Amino acid sequence: MMHIPNRSIQAANIFFSSGAILLLIVGLIMEDWVELIPKVRKDKTTHSPWLGCCPPFWPEESLEVVRRIMRMTLNISIYLNLIIGLQFSYMISQNKCVHLLVGFLSFFAGCLLFYAIIVYHHKLNKGQYVYFVNYKTKWIAFTVYLTIALFLTCGIFCFIQSTNRCECMKFCIPHTESKSQEMIPSTIEVVSLPPRCAMPRSIVHVHSVTSKDGSLNRPHTQARRVTWAL
């Protein structure tokens, strides 16, 4: 089974959280989320849930909840990106609790943003029959769903990292290191020592002295001559 290294997961989380912040900032700058057509005048008016004021024909208090949730989501995403960056640079610990915290914040931010966009569409449908005739959704409104997907993906990766942290550290070994470890046993060779040379046989010549009466006289000290047979 193949496991993703921790550094790759953290790099992907930084990319996803940074992309979510970028999309939220783009949605904050762009003001034409929807195009409203009022009943009295036929002039088209653009609107965004980030705006601090609503059109004169649409009461402001009806969208205050949506605006607060969107701001809360932006703040959470900034803190989330900061925590992931500190974790990637080893400035905070990389234990299981930190991974679970980052995953919870990612899911919480995604759920908050999803709730905000659902409430905003509900307010649009409700105001269509009271304050304006029709509305048309622009392309910038669909970036919210991409932001939600980025938050959820970041949370899933954090939970995977918290559950498979030990397995990743155990099995995800670099290719060069594993190859060198496999080659170590094969390089060991048993070198046998040459057989111990046997000592050459020696031929000992004992010189005896013959006495005058013909008997062999073996003195106490005998003279010996050693000849090595090679």
Swiss-Prot record:
One of its GO terms (molecular function) is protein phosphatase inhibitor activity. It comes from the Eukaryota. The chain crosses the membrane at residues 9-29, 72-92, 100-120, 140-160. It is a multi-pass membrane protein. Expressed in testis, epididymis and spermatozoa (at protein level). Not expressed in brain, heart, lung, liver, spleen, kidney and skeletal muscle. Pfam families: TM225. Probably inhibits protein phosphatase 1 (PP1) in sperm via binding to catalytic subunit PPP1CC. Interacts (via RVxF motif) with PPP1CC. This is Transmembrane protein 225.
